[in-house]
Amino acid sequence: MYSKVVLDRFMSPNHCGLIKNADVVATFTSEATGDMVKLYLSLDKDKIVDAKFKAFGSPLTICASDIMCEMLFGKTLEEATALSNKEVEDIMDMPKTEKLHASVMLEELVVEATKIYKKKK
């Protein structure tokens, strides 16, 4: 059974979509589950001003992606990489074993997005 938070964000995610001319586009696919998330970021003076995602996967992956995008606003990429999957999991309000893969996947995705952005500069 999913928490109310997971169901609400799965049915009506706030940050699902793409950003035209995004400064960073990073994709991560979980080998364990096959879930895939594509993260789009727009930055202004090295701060994240917009974050959106496209995902194929479980309600947990959709929910975790939506939460992560929300948490990224206003942060630098360095600050974003310091965000932990635990912070996402706390908001999801699910038993740890049920959500771990989704939040860990997103933590790795933010690190990948940071690497891509640094290569572009």
Q: Language-model segments: which ranges?
A:
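Domain-level signature for proteins that mediate thiol-based redox and metal-cofactor handling
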Residues: 1-121
